[in-house]
């Protein structure tokens, strides 16, 4: 009986921790300011699209050769960053 209780406790813990991780990832897309997106995307080229309150990041920083650009390149695989836009738009 003790073994079943321990397994049940572990299962509940796993469920609760996975729920909180999914919640944290979903919150990253929602924004009200550009600063929130820069923090969530971990790059300076991110901004908040106020039409849908979603973080957007541009890849133009990766395409430049100028070493004086202060922007950090956005990491396209970063989960909390929202959607990509082309620098040609």
Swiss-Prot record:
Residues 1-20 form the signal peptide. GO terms for biological process: defense response to fungus; killing of cells of another organism. Disulfide bonds join 31-48, 37-55. Keywords: Antimicrobial, Disulfide bond, Fungicide, Plant defense, Secreted, Signal. GO terms for cellular component: extracellular region. It is found in: Secreted. Belongs to the DEFL family. This is Putative defensin-like protein 254.
């Amino acid at each position: 009986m003790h073994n079943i209780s321990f397994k049940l406790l572990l299962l509940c813990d796993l469920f609760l921790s996975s729920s909180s991780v999914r919640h944290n990832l979903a919150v990253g897309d929602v924004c009200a300011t550009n600063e929130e997106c820069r923090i969530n995307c971990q790059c300076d080229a991110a901004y908040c699209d106020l039409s849908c309150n979603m973080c957007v990041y541009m890849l133009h920083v990766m395409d430049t050769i100028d070493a004086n650009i202060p922007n950090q390149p956005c990491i396209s695989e970063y989960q909390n960053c929202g959607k990509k836009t082309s620098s040609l738009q």
